[in-house]
Regions:
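Conserved nucleotide-cofactor-binding alpha/beta core module
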Residues: 80-199
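Class I SAM-dependent transferase core
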Residues: 2-89, 97-101, 105, 118-132, ...
Length: 217
């Protein structure tokens, strides 16, 4: 198959995906535009490239998945709910797809991934897409990135059992944590740092891979 053939097919299937996201209630133009312009097929194994623009989660190896586009879009809309965040901490960046989407929506991203080969893969793809406002680190997301705190937004694509206090402590005043929380049953939580303390809001039921402690080489 020629590159052009792949390109034309992916353009058509991308538009179909955008339409599906709109049908599911995703309305923010900049989020839809980011999903339209970021080539999702670069972030999955070649064998799965033909499924890149389906609205489904896809395996990326190491027991990890590339989040469903609807979930990426929903998290991105929530990220922008209080305006454009300047400094963002992303936990569990995987192969870098959500990172690439967010990069056009925020000023600066610090991204952490615990699996070393995925860090290298994400770095390579982000470089290929000329994404310049992301710093990527191999580390334990549950520790956050204290030396870069505070953050206007902390966003995670893996679920800890409980809200991690050390992450809440890295929020700027008025900053928000958007994270799936729980075991078998998970809730997407949004926690805002206010002068009176942390205000928690359950958004919807979700299903993410668990957020694990430690790092993996």
């Amino acid at each position: 198959v020629s590159q052009q053939g792949i390109g034309m097919t992916s353009q058509r299937t991308r538009e179909r995906l955008i339409q599906r996201l709109m049908d599911q209630g995703i309305t923010r133009f900049e989020v839809l535009e980011a999903i339209r312009s970021v080539p999702r097929h670069l972030f999955v194994d070649e064998a799965l490239a033909h499924r890149s623009y389906e609205d489904t989660a896809l395996p990326i190896g190491y027991g990890q998945t590339l989040s469903q586009p609807y979930v990426v879009a929903r998290m991105s809309e929530l990220a922008l709910a209080k305006g454009r965040p300047k400094k963002v901490l992303e936990l569990g960046s995987g192969s870098g797809y959500q990172t690439a989407i967010l990069a056009s929506l925020v000023d600066e991203i610090c991204a952490i991934e615990r699996i070393k080969p995925l860090v290298e893969r994400a770095r390579k793809q982000l470089r290929a897409l000329r994404v310049r406002n992301v710093r990527l680190r191999h580390g334990d997301g549950l520790d956050g990135w204290g030396s870069e705190a505070p953050f206007d937004l902390i966003l995670g694509a893996a679920a800890p059992e409980h809200l991690p206090t050390q992450l809440l402590e890295q929020l700027a005043p008025g900053g928000r944590l958007i994270l799936p929380v729980g075991g078998e049953r998970q809730q997407l939580m949004m926690v805002t740092a206010t002068p009176e303390g942390y205000v928690e809001e359950a958004i919807e039921e979700v299903n993410f891979v668990p957020m694990l402690r430690g790092v993996s080489r």
